[in-house]
Amino acid sequence: MTLDERDLELIREELGRDPNATERAMFENMWSEHCAYRSTRHLLRQLPSEADHVIVGPGDDAAVVAIDDEWAVVVGIESHNHPSYVDPYNGAATGVGGIVRDVLSMGAFPIALLDPLRFGPLDGERVPYLVDGVVRGISDYGNRIGVPTVGGELEFDPSYERNPLVNVMCVGIVRRSEIVRGRADRPGDVLVLVGARTGRDGIGGAAFASEELGEESEEEDRPAVQIGDPFTERQLIIAIREAVERGLVKGCKDLGAAGLTCAATEMAADGGTGVEIDVFKVPLREEGMEPWEIMLSESQERMLLVVAPEDVDEVIEICRKYGLEASVVGRVTDDGYLTVKDGDDVIARVPAEFLADGAPEVEWEEEPYSYPENVDVPEPDPEDLVRSVLSSPNVSPALREWVYRQYDHEVQGRTVVKPGHDAAVMWLQHEGLEDVALALTTDSNPRHVLIDPKTGTEGCVAEALRNLATVGAEPLCLVDCLNFGSPENPRVYYQLRRSIEGLGKAAREFEVPVVGGNVSLYNEHEVDGPVNPTPVIGAVGVIRGLDYLEDFPREPEEGEAVIVLGETREELGGSLYLIEYHGIKGGKVPRVRYREERALHDLLRRIARKNMVSSVTDVSTGGLLAAVAELLGPVGASLSLSEVPNSVSRWDFLLLSESHGRAIVTTDRPDDVLGAAEEAGVPAQVVGEVTGDGVLRISVGPVDVSLDREELEELWRSPLHYLE
């Protein structure tokens, strides 16, 4: 990135002179889209972020939300998209490391990771290499630092072929008395740099993330990708937590984008102070580094602590006990400036608040667009349709299992509901939380968002909260990771603005605060153009009282009833069926009917917590066909889906509509479930029973389909040949 003339004029006016080379480099990174959110700050302000239980909202390294009077959950979400295309293994690994340190910087102990991933079609020349590298990077790093990866998403679409999306969400737990903020608010305090030595890896990473990828990116941009060291990260987690427990940490920041410049500047700006950094005191991994390189290096596994002078020796002693370097590199001042020194020489001096928050906001031109709602859909051959949908990489449970089997999802011994379900459940175990768990999920549907950005994003929120409800959880908060193309493209900027509007509307309707997030723009390639608009929604819920989870969810047994909850409507816009099977972009995108959706969520929580059901899944990508196959295929069932509450005109629409507000449950107490549904005002119908013979029989209108377990598993496993 380079500063434009308007930026330079503003900087000259503030400084009263031209910025020198070091100052200019710092402004280029701090005022990049990646750091400054220049195109989205004004849009994000409309999101509801406040609630009585929100302790720290947007603006710090991670959000903090109260669980009770003593404990809080810390949650953050980040993207590492460009680095993961250039170097998939290290790009993904350092994405994990960075978000873990964000959660750690708030004083929390990280307990879970989720990884929403998006790639091009598996038959793409470079895609299997990207998938393998990204999954190994996440697996190796997460497993070695001892934080379980318990959920996420996996999607394949041509728009991601040269710009994969690698998002990571991290959740931690902290005593409210031990929460640390990313600020330096006491002049005289000392800045201590802890962790790995500083090298040249990742220099300019913030600027690199603010540009589109090109044909030469794999080689030209490799120096902008950081290299991770999970062993050092593990020691950092232990050491920082010990220092926090002893009350020695007054402020803390991860050194991520723009490195030491960003960490020091934001701490000063948020604390209303200044900071002085001496680059001569920064431990280096490479000789001959220039001051600007030291200030902008994004070398991993480094954190900047604010420590009282009298506590410095104790903090350094703790770090050394765990084999970590810890060096005093500066101090907090009262002058409001970031002053960079090299020994006695002043290298740079700029107002901290101006550097952190002074980048002008940008409103780009936008170009509204729409796709036709009324589209002609050829009637398919039933056998071909069923096999095509169930063998899609976007449906295959086997492909997702191939991913999560590489992760240690049970380390720490907290994982009660494991990957493969609609939401993960993590038992908290701590004193006072023995009967409390967190439910975690991430969700997005870029195909819906592409066709209708606002309505599609509302649906992403509804699905995330619906998934929490399937395991009996009450929602606590949302975070978002907004992955879009260049805002300079008028269609993309329209998508971005409307998507954020949809997120805000849904959050207000469901009364769940959006407490933090990440914006990743310029996700496009000079050949392929922008990725599909991809707002990933992370949701955290709380469960109080865990007895029902001893026997839920479980595999359904022979004779249990299968019940479909909610109405299926003729809403196929952006569906897997229209886009992937027919190649049609258009149709009516599923609309969120908030009263109906809230009623379903309440019902799902009730029937789960009262052990009325053995298993449950919501209906989303791939419609009823994908949902019943995943839930019932391995055990076998006989289903008449024409009985489903519906308002559709064709059997294929009934089978593959992606209407919201629906779920499928199995139960040996059908009368109780139907009674609860009637009381909640949710349409419900028994559509068949579990047979236990390993054969899935589906009757819908004039069509009868039968698949045995082996056939179904063969379809699900068919995409794996690209990866094995």
UniProtKB/Swiss-Prot annotation:
Main localization category: cytoplasm
Keyword ATP-binding: yes
Chain positions recorded as substrate binding sites: S79, H80, N81, H82, R101, Q226, E298, S299, Q300, S520
Residues reported in the UniProt entry to bind Mg(2+) 1: E78, N518
Binding, Mg(2+) 2: D102, D254
EC id: 6.3.5.3
SUPFAM superfamilies documented for this protein: PurM C-terminal domain-like, PurM N-terminal domain-like
Record's GO cellular component terms: cytoplasm
GO molecular function list: ATP binding; magnesium ion binding; phosphoribosylformylglycinamidine synthase activity
InterPro entries named in the record: PRibForGlyAmidine_synth_PurL (IPR010074), PurL_linker (IPR041609), PurM-like_C_dom (IPR010918), PurM-like_C_sf (IPR036676), PurM-like_N (IPR016188), PurM-like_N_sf (IPR036921)
UniProt-listed HAMAP family: PurL_2 (MF_00420)
Family under the similarity heading: Belongs to the FGAMS family.
Name of the protein: Phosphoribosylformylglycinamidine synthase subunit PurL
Species, as recorded: Methanopyrus kandleri (strain AV19 / DSM 6324 / JCM 9639 / NBRC 100938)
